[in-house]
Amino acid sequence: MYSIRKQSRNLQRKWNSNITNRYPIKRKYVAGHTRPCVRRRLLYEPVERPFGHNVLCEKQHGDVFNLQQNTSYTSFVTYPSRGPSGDGRSRDYIKLQSMSVSGVIHAKANGNDDPMEVSPVVNGVFVFSLIMDTKPYLPAGVQGLPTFEELFGPYSACYVNLRLLNNQQHRYRVLHSVKRFVSSSGDTKVSQFRFNKRLSTRRYTIWASFHDGDLVNAGGNYRNISKNAILVSYAFVSEHAMSCKPFVQIETSYVG
């Protein structure tokens, strides 16, 4: 006679689980009862444009840039605005690649209106500087950017290597500077300058970020930049009555 061996409890549990998985229990809903609510609305975020390489060209000239002897003017490099149409930047930050700067200087001696009179030769020094502002900030009600004297000290600093004051080195950094010695005897003298400045390298990358509260206020002006703005300092120093009129073009290469 053969005896039937009882199955172990573990084997029974395994057999029951296989049956349950193979033939799932169908739940029936009784009339009067409703199914629980399930949120089926999907949240779609706007698709951001991919990064792209662009070049922004800006020209700086006009009456505000006309310099008399021992005067200066400070402006800034305009960054691209943010827009969904494909122009400008696609994020609230950009990668600064390089800058190409070119320009001419019109220098002229002042105070001689008689063309028959021979004017003595007068000299002056024009200084153009690019300065990185790592933490751009302007207090409420203040419109002017830091002057040459606030950054470098007296105008006599134009004759030597430019060095930021000790109390400004924690925020500013000189990227590049150009000096041109100009002379005039009454007529206008023109001097040219040109240079290229590499900003980001394989080992060191410079990013600029923006506040961008909304797309309406997502410009590239100084007040909207939260990190790494670039100031442009114009200075002209001379011991004679001279005027200097620059015309500068700045091409900023960026990824954003």
Curated annotation (Swiss-Prot):
The keyword 4Fe-4S appears for this protein: no
Segments of this protein annotated with the region Interaction with Arabidopsis thaliana NSI protein: 150-187
UniProt membrane topology term: Peripheral membrane protein
Family statement drawn from the similarity comment of this UniProt entry: Belongs to the begomovirus nuclear shuttle protein family.
Function text: Binds to the genomic viral ssDNA, shuttles it into and out of the cell nucleus. Begomoviruses use 2 proteins to transport their DNA from cell to cell. The nuclear shuttle protein (NSP) shuttles it between nucleus and cytoplasm and the movement protein (MP) probably transports the DNA-NSP complex to the cell periphery and facilitates movement across the cell wall.
GO cellular component, one term: membrane
Short name of one Pfam family: Gemini_coat
Top-level taxon: Viruses
Protein name: Nuclear shuttle protein
Protein's cellular compartments: Host nucleus; Host cytoplasm; Host cell membrane
Residue window of motif Nuclear localization signal: 81-96
A GO biological process held by the record: transport of virus in host, cell to cell
Any one Gene Ontology molecular-function term assigned to this protein's record: single-stranded DNA binding
Record key words, sorted: DNA-binding, Host cell membrane, Host cytoplasm, Host membrane, Host nucleus, Host-virus interaction, Membrane, Transport, Viral movement protein
InterPro entries: Gemini_BR1 (IPR001530), GV_A/BR1_coat (IPR000263), Viral_coat (IPR029053)
Motif (Bipartite nuclear localization signal): 18-39
Assembly with partners or alone: Binds to single-stranded and double-stranded viral DNA. Interacts with the host nuclear shuttle interacting (NSI) protein. This interaction may allow NSP to recruit NSI monomers to the viral genome and thus regulate nuclear export of viral genome by NSP.
